[in-house]
């Protein structure tokens, strides 16, 4: 029988003294290593857009073998890996299309979600094509959405995960700040626009972290690993405007392996 997330913690605390008393006899039989049942949900930051090496069977979802979920699964022998994250996914897409493999046997779930609900692509398009005033107005609209509408949408997703897999460890990962302010970029967006974009990233991370914590989920802050590797840093782990255009403002292969993967490793 699998225990609930809270019950498992309590049982571990109760079991520790018993193991101390009977450790010698318990050590006679080495425990069998159990395979981890891992489901990776979310949007393009989880599917690995921008990292290359896409699984052709994933189509427009662009699931990459260089994404942090695929790298985590490959480095943990015996992992049963279900990869349903998809480029462009919103919270409603997770609910409608991605949760099938999440069940009472699931051990680990990871997810990035919310950026597309808040208008990530449209915001960055506006900022690059319409100038500072339009950019700042679009960012303000996105930040209002993040504060007023996104929390309830995240709750729906997190409630669904918790209901389907009450004993699973759930790791919710955030988004990196895009820009190093005062950095090396001589052209492109204004510094004011860059600062506003970073502030919006901080907003969505704060909202996501709060909703995750309220569900008993871990939150992984990737700004700890991306620091010094933002756009305009001289050593970015994010694509700037590039071709194919969908790679723009997404993690590179280094962003996945050195930015996201260490955060998931730390949480698990």
Swiss-Prot record:
Active site: 44, 250
TM region(s), chain numbering: none
Signal sequence segment: 1-34
Main location: secreted
Enzyme class: hydrolase
GO cellular component, one term: extracellular region
E.C. code: 3.1.1.3, 3.1.1.-, 3.1.2.2
GO biological process: triglyceride catabolic process
Reactions the enzyme catalyzes: a triacylglycerol + H2O = a diacylglycerol + a fatty acid + H(+); hexadecanoyl-CoA + H2O = hexadecanoate + CoA + H(+)
Summary of activators and inhibitors of this protein: Inhibited by 3,4-dichloroisocoumarin and tetrahydrolipstatin in the absence of substrate, but by phenylmethylsulfonyl fluoride (PMSF) only in the presence of substrate. Several water-miscible solvents enhance the lipase hydrolytic activity in vitro. Tetrahydrofuran and N,N-dimethylformamide (both 50%) inactivate the enzyme with t1/2 of 5 minutes and t1/2 of 2 hours, respectively.
Pfam family for this entry, one: Lipase_GDSL_2
pH dependence: Optimum pH is 9.5.
PANTHER family: LIPASE 2 (PTHR37981), SGNH HYDROLASE-TYPE ESTERASE DOMAIN-CONTAINING PROTEIN (PTHR37981:SF1)
Entry protein name: Lipase
Species per Swiss-Prot/TrEMBL record: Streptomyces rimosus
């Amino acid at each position: 029988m699998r225990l609930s997330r809270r019950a498992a913690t309590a049982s571990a605390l109760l079991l520790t003294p018993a193991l101390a008393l009977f450790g010698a006899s318990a050590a006679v039989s080495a425990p069998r290593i159990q395979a981890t049942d891992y489901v990776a949900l979310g949007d393009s930051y989880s599917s690995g857009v921008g990292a290359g090496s896409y699984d052709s069977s994933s189509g427009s979802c662009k699931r990459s073998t260089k994404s942090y979920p695929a790298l985590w699964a490959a480095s943990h022998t015996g992992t049963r890996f279900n990869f349903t994250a998809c480029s462009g996914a919103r919270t409603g897409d997770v609910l409608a299309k991605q949760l099938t493999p999440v069940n009472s046997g699931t051990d680990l779930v990871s997810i990035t979600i919310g950026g597309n609900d808040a208008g990530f692509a449209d915001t960055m398009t506006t900022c690059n094509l319409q100038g500072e005033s339009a950019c700042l107005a679009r960012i303000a609209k996105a930040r209002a959405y993040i504060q007023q509408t996104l929390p309830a949408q995240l709750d729906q997703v997190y409630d669904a995960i918790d209901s389907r897999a009450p004993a699973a460890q759930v790791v919710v990962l955030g988004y990196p700040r895009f820009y190093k302010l005062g950095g090396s970029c001589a052209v492109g967006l204004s510094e004011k626009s860059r600062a506003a974009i970073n502030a919006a990233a901080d907003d969505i991370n704060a909202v996501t972290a709060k909703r995750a914590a309220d569900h008993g989920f871990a939150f992984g802050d990737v700004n700890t690993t991306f620091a010094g590797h933002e756009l305009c840093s001289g050593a970015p782990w994010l694509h700037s405007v590039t071709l194919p255009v969908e790679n723009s403002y997404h993690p590179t292969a280094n962003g996945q392996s050195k930015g996201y993967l260490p955060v998931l490793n730390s949480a698990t």
